[in-house]
Amino acid sequence: MSITAAQVNELRKITGAGLMDCKKALTETNGDLEQAVDYLRKKGLAAASKKAGRAATEGAVGSYIHAGGKIGVLVEVNCETDFVARNDNFQAFVKDIAMHIAAASPQYVRREEVPAELLEREKEIYRAKARETGKPENIIEKIIEGQINKFYAEICLMEQNFVKDPDKTVQQFLNETISSIGENMSVRRFARFVLGEGLEKKESDFAAEVAAAAGL
């Protein structure tokens, strides 16, 4: 069935969950609002949203160095209190995120950070390809929307499939951790370094090496 914007907005008001999460929840539950709320709660998304407005100014800068020193990552993850910043679960989360960044090579933390000019360029490429199919404009726009969401999932950390559990996104992993720890958390920024990046060298699959080192 078709999910309307009004349904999505209503679910967002109730749960405070993200737009795409609400849309997916309604799709999975055939538009049943009550079931969609339960769906989000089971995923940890609704519970996390209740904490989202609280300031997260403590935290830690974590690091990950790939075996052999070929890839290095620094990532800043914020939480509300210094007590939680020293918590083993929080520290494990920071380490897992740093390892994920090393393996998946995201370019941005979230979709809002993607430059408008880059996004528009991608849309034009997708639009040109879609028009070659001869489909109506309304169908073409839906195709473009789907392609852009895939693009976000490739380059935005929070929308990537988590390398240690590909059945969930990094955002879902974050939400689950927020629910278990009981404090708001946020991945603020990261930097990823590759040995010899920009220099002419023999190609190798660093992502596969990182995954292998993590036992994935």
Swiss-Prot record:
Gene3D superfamilies: 1.10.286.20, DNA helicase RuvA subunit, C-terminal domain, Elongation factor Ts, dimerisation domain. It is found in: Cytoplasm. One of its GO terms (biological process) is translational elongation. Keywords: Cytoplasm, Elongation factor, Protein biosynthesis. It comes from the Bacteria. GO terms for cellular component: cytoplasm. The keyword Cytoplasm applies. InterPro entries: EF-Ts_dimer_sf (IPR036402), Transl_elong_EFTs/EF1B (IPR001816), Transl_elong_EFTs/EF1B_dimer (IPR014039), Transl_elong_Ts_CS (IPR018101), UBA-like_sf (IPR009060). Residues 81-84 are annotated as: Involved in Mg(2+) ion dislocation from EF-Tu. One of its GO terms (molecular function) is translation elongation factor activity. Pfam families: EF_TS. Associates with the EF-Tu.GDP complex and induces the exchange of GDP to GTP. It remains bound to the aminoacyl-tRNA.EF-Tu.GTP complex up to the GTP hydrolysis stage on the ribosome. HAMAP family: EF_Ts. Belongs to the EF-Ts family. This is Elongation factor Ts. The gene is tsf.
